[in-house]
Amino acid sequence: MALHLSLSHQSWTSPAHPITSSDPTRSSVPGTGLSRRVDFLGSCKINGVFVVKRKDRRRMRGGEVRASMEQALGTQEMEAIVGKVTEVNKDTFWPIVKAAGDKPVVLDMFTQWCGPCKAMAPKYEKLAEEYLDVIFLKLDCNQENKTLAKELGIRVVPTFKILKENSVVGEVTGAKYDKLLEAIQAARSS
């Protein structure tokens, strides 16, 4: 199943020109000759978050950008949304970490009843908006995710795990914003 979208400035401003147009005069960036065509192979929503795998992303000849995605359930690799905090569970965490490749991944391990966790949440969301080269995840350490929390060695909440290339490279325990920021910057530069 493939969904082809061609977007242009004209199609966004004029209802007479639908965004599904494949007319090259309407699917290019005005004055540049560059195409805005994107091909999608599939997607899914997990816990209300749009999650995808990019199989191939490269700049094509003439400026065309092509991205393809596969159904992201089961053992398929997944990718979190950049610039947002993505909530994960025991089933979605490792596939997202694997899909991140060499990008740093920061995991906020929290509980609903934890006061310091609630205090850190807005700061953590701002970090996600600021550091677009880092994947920000959060894991509710409830009964359902207990096995993953144990696997990651949680002892206190909040705990922030910093991962890179499928391995934990840093940890910050407690609501220590400055230490978290240092750990993120260290992971980005390594």
From Swiss-Prot:
Disulfide bonds join C114-C117. It comes from the Eukaryota. Residues 7-30 have a biased composition (Polar residues). CDD domains: TRX_family. InterPro entries: Thioredoxin-like_sf, Thioredoxin_CS, Thioredoxin_domain. GO terms for cellular component: chloroplast; cytosol. It is found in: Plastid, Chloroplast. The record marks D108 as: Deprotonates C-terminal active site Cys. SUPFAM superfamilies: Thioredoxin-like. Gene3D superfamilies: Glutaredoxin. This is Thioredoxin F-type, chloroplastic.
